[in-house]
Amino acid sequence: MTSPQKAILAGGCFWGMQDLIRKQPGVIATRVGYSGGDVANATYRNHGTHAEAVEIIFDPQATDYRTLLEFFFQIHDPTTPNRQGNDRGTSYRSAIYYLDDEQKRVALDTIADVEASGLWPGKVVTEVSPAGDFWEAEPEHQHYLQRYPSGYTCHFIRPGWKLPRRATAGQ
């Protein structure tokens, strides 16, 4: 039996990110919080330079990190610095917080595929950084759109969106 693995992704308001990611095959659990910044014990009211992020626990026998990243790049715009939809500021930046060298390699390779694909109109600005502390958000932010299905989101699945791999990928 393979142990569950973890991913930490930031792509704008964590409500919409969590709601879509939690439904993906192989995802065991998600929680929203703050990561990639400078404040200990971050909260919604005081999270300094942290991004709103989603911690994902997944079964590597049912999905893989690359598949999660491809979905991540489908549901948010990785070309807008510090912005998703109407949300602006460093809290809403696009970021991948990797937990090991293999996650870093896969993240950089996936970004290169996104760049080469032309699926997004600009240059990818997604930050790729080592994972630091993940500060879990307050209970009212956890699974927000499950409790309030008509609540705010700027994330959506783009029908027909498929990320091709570059011919040189993995070489």
From Swiss-Prot:
Function (record text): Has an important function as a repair enzyme for proteins that have been inactivated by oxidation. Catalyzes the reversible oxidation-reduction of methionine sulfoxide in proteins to methionine.
Enzyme Commission no: 1.8.4.11
Swiss-Prot/TrEMBL catalytic activity: L-methionyl-[protein] + [thioredoxin]-disulfide + H2O = L-methionyl-(S)-S-oxide-[protein] + [thioredoxin]-dithiol; [thioredoxin]-disulfide + L-methionine + H2O = L-methionine (S)-S-oxide + [thioredoxin]-dithiol
Active site residues per record: C13
GO biological process: protein modification process
Protein's organism: Mycobacterium ulcerans (strain Agy99)
Record family assignment: Belongs to the MsrA Met sulfoxide reductase family.
Gene encoding the protein: msrA
Protein name: Peptide methionine sulfoxide reductase MsrA
Keywords from the UniProt entry: Oxidoreductase
GO molecular-function terms, A-Z: L-methionine:thioredoxin-disulfide S-oxidoreductase activity; peptide-methionine (S)-S-oxide reductase activity
NCBIfam families linked: msrA
Lineage of source species: Bacteria, Bacillati, Actinomycetota, Actinomycetes, Mycobacteriales
Keyword Oxidoreductase included in the entry's annotation: yes
InterPro entries assigned to the protein according to its UniProt record, in alphabetical order: Met_Sox_Rdtase_MsrA_dom (IPR002569), Met_Sox_Rdtase_MsrA_sf (IPR036509)
Top EC class, one word: oxidoreductase
